[in-house]
Amino acid sequence: MRSNPTTSGSEVSAVEKKNLGRIVKIIGPVLDVAFPPGKMPNIYNALVVQGRDNEQTNVTCEVQQLLGNNRVRAVAMSDTNGLMRGMEVINTGAPISVPVGGSTLGRIFNVLGQPVDNLGPVDTNTTSPIHRSAPAFIQLDTKLSIFETGIKVVDLLAPYRRGGKIGLFGGAGVGKTVLIMELINNIAKAHGGVSVFGGVGERTREGNDLYMEMKESGVINEENIAESKVALVYGQMNEPPGARMRVGLTALTMAEYFRDVNEQDVLLFIDNIFRFVQAGSEVSALLGRMPSAVGYQPTLSTEMGTLQERITSTKEGSITSIQAVYVPADDLTDPAPATTFAHLDATTVLSRGLAAKGIYPAVDPLDSTSTMLQPRIVGEEHYETAQRVKQTLQRYKELQDIIAILGLDELSEEDRLTVARARKIERFLSQPFFVAEVFTGSPGKYVGLAETIRGFQLILSGELDGLPEQAFYLVGNIDEATAKAMNLKT
């Protein structure tokens, strides 16, 4: 495919206006457009529908198929209401391009990179096409390194890989949003990095709530928007499938600029990766492709790979991606989640049971996993501590039925000690968050990995057996727990 100049959104020069076609067929969000011979657009080029009497309709489409007989099939990125056969269509000669750089921080964009937050135009002339190749092998940084988050339960039991992909599993109301905001806050403070949030096919209300909470917690700075730590890109579930399918690429393009040009560590959030697959399935059916297993598109693995392979570490910087994964009907063998799992380096599972106990972050220490938790990567000390913590919690889980029926007194001395330590560990895995200060009143804590390991080693060794378990609840490092225990005694 020959390379094209890029155009921002629907900017069209006078020269490009010669490349006019006409709509010959409309089927929902899919348009067939006829062009003059020799003026055919390339695959992925952006087309802009011109209204009657030069009235701009602002419907941008993306070429998906070349049908022959000088016709192309394109998918609309916005509503096709009011479009008619015979309307003029401009070939922009380039893929959809979106604004990139520091001026995107604190703003909300749609799939075309247009701001939708009523704060005026974006102060940048730098744009980038949403379709790019993944970095070449020679550019990749193959060194395995931990991405420290400052969140104890994550760093100890399911550590994130720098430039890796993490699946976030959890129902409504278990603290997913607060965890995401804390990660955005911590990457800015500890790594000098920024974040991009891609809302793919989720509820508009949730997107609005997230924006309001980010403003409240300071992740988005209303007074000085340039001091914000995140850019937001939304393609919500009321939008056509074309927009939902491409909004993930828009967010990724913004993240790639921070990695490649600004040489920063970037966090890319995709909520929800299942909706990306779902939108691709809808588009595939509209384009007339034969469906494969469970009605999904035959190109499912290719589409997922095209997105996921661009999320990686290079020698300049890294994009670490956290993707919320909806599992339809809790069926992990469904092709959509199964294809996603092939790309994940770690999973963070949020538990309603822990949230009900008031233990936040409600990350399940036994269900959450990471490929990074190996002695050759994290070191013997970290690995041993994590395994002993998991064994203690697993034994406590096994004993819970006996405790519920017979009571603690019927357990052996050894088991009673295990239960006491497990309850301390469970509480010590909780942590006050910076972004939750406005709700809880207690200051947030960033706990380094070395401090985290030291704290759990002290609990496991029995040195802190004499302290009350409530001293370990919602504290930062272990020194705070011992200080809290002293206060409880007085």
Curated annotation (Swiss-Prot):
UniProt protein name: ATP synthase subunit beta, chloroplastic
* Its biological purpose: Produces ATP from ADP in the presence of a proton gradient across the membrane. The catalytic sites are hosted primarily by the beta subunits.
SUPFAM superfamilies from the xrefs?
A: C-terminal domain of alpha and beta subunits of F1 ATP synthase, N-terminal domain of alpha and beta subunits of F1 ATP synthase, P-loop containing nucleoside triphosphate hydrolases
Q: Which reaction does it catalyse?
A: ATP + H2O + 4 H(+)(in) = ADP + phosphate + 5 H(+)(out)
Protein localization = Plastid, Chloroplast thylakoid membrane
What the entry lists under HAMAP family is as follows: ATP_synth_beta_bact
Gene that encodes it: atpB
Q: Entry's InterPro entries? A: AAA+_ATPase (IPR003593), ATP-synt_VA_C (IPR055190), ATP_synth_F1_bsu (IPR005722), ATPase_a/bsu_AS (IPR020003), ATPase_alpha/beta_chains (IPR050053), ATPase_F1/V1/A1_a/bsu_N (IPR004100), ATPase_F1/V1/A1_a/bsu_N_sf (IPR036121), ATPase_F1/V1/A1_a/bsu_nucl-bd (IPR000194)
Origin organism is: Calystegia sepium
The reply on keyword Chloroplast is yes
Q: EC number(s) on record?
A: 7.1.2.2
Q: What is the protein's quaternary organization?
A: F-type ATPases have 2 components, CF(1) - the catalytic core - and CF(0) - the membrane proton channel. CF(1) has five subunits: alpha(3), beta(3), gamma(1), delta(1), epsilon(1). CF(0) has four main subunits: a(1), b(1), b'(1) and c(9-12).
Residues binding ATP:
G170, G171, A172, G173, V174, G175, K176, T177
